Amino acid sequence: MSQKKNIKRMLTVLIMALLSTISFAQDVNLANGVEPLPSGEQTPGSEYTLVFHDEFNEPNGTLPNTKVWRYCTRYPKVIWARFLSSSPEVAYMQDGNLVLCAIPNPDKLKDNVEMLSGGIETSQSFTFRFGRVECRALVNPFIGNFPAIWMMPKTTLGWPKGGEIDIFEQIDNEQRCYATVHSAWTQSHGNEPHSGNLRMPMNRYYIYAVEWEEDVLTFFVDGKRVYQYKKQNDSQEQWPFDKSNFYLILNQSVGNGSWAKKPDVNHTYEMLIDWIRVYQKQKHIPTVISVPMTKIKECTESNDVYLLQGTKMEMKESELPKGIYVSNGKKFIK
């Protein structure tokens, strides 16, 4: 550590006392480089604590915060991922929204694909197990449209063994949203329901949500239950949803004819995301959150860096945004 950082650590106890009124959610916001929840906004209930959110209120043209979000990786043979790009034209802030696009490729000599699409995820910065995810979004139905708000596991297991939680999908020009669960079980038991949908006009914003508990996944649109998927046994095949942490994915893709139809490659597809928020019940928040704000004590024996609420930061210390962290049993401020 540099001398400057050591001095900061020596002042930690005093600073923690001064910060003792800061909520855990605010601590997470500081560490994730996102702003506090707007005043007057409702939460799911007193049993939940806000542990992550992004309001996407940066100035117009700002790109997604790379300390929180990372661009999804392109996989040419995977439908949703075949056109993914880190181009600033497919993921940016505009009028208080994250805008995700699938656009005609303006330079096929540079990148030989028909379209470029936007997608971002949190696998390296934020993962969690159990809780409630809410995302306020607006989509624009059109032939070939295929936007999604979803989650994947942080696991070495191949798809679909680790599971997949699709909070929201919409296809083509349908006035309908879908909520779906994928696992090895759903693949091998095709006759068993693992998806629900709701017909509704898609010309306005909705809050899409999932409540993820130890034995059930419940999906909502504006508070109305759309679908529920229950645990049937303890197997990895049927219920992988208590075996791994999951991370968030937001993307605007296009179909290929297998579910969503083939796109009009000259059309610009667009999804607007106002905000995304994750809440957890106290029992599901990692126990490191219990470290007193006014006392430094041993809480980890490794050199890994954690947020106060327990999320491991998958980045070098030099890359951390400003905030309060725990490492080597001590809190420090960067």
Question: Model-flagged regions — what are they?
Answer:
Residues S2-T12:
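Bacterial N-terminal signal peptides that target proteins for export
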Residues Q3, A17, Q26-L30:
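N-terminal targeting leaders of exported, membrane, and organelle-targeted proteins
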Residues Q3, E41-Y48, I296-E301:
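Extreme N-terminus of proteins, especially the signal/transit-peptide cleavage junction
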Residues Q3, T21-F24, E47, S86, ...:
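Compositionally biased regions
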Residues Q26-P286:
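GH16 jelly-roll
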Residues V288-K334:
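C-terminal outer-membrane/trafficking sorting elements
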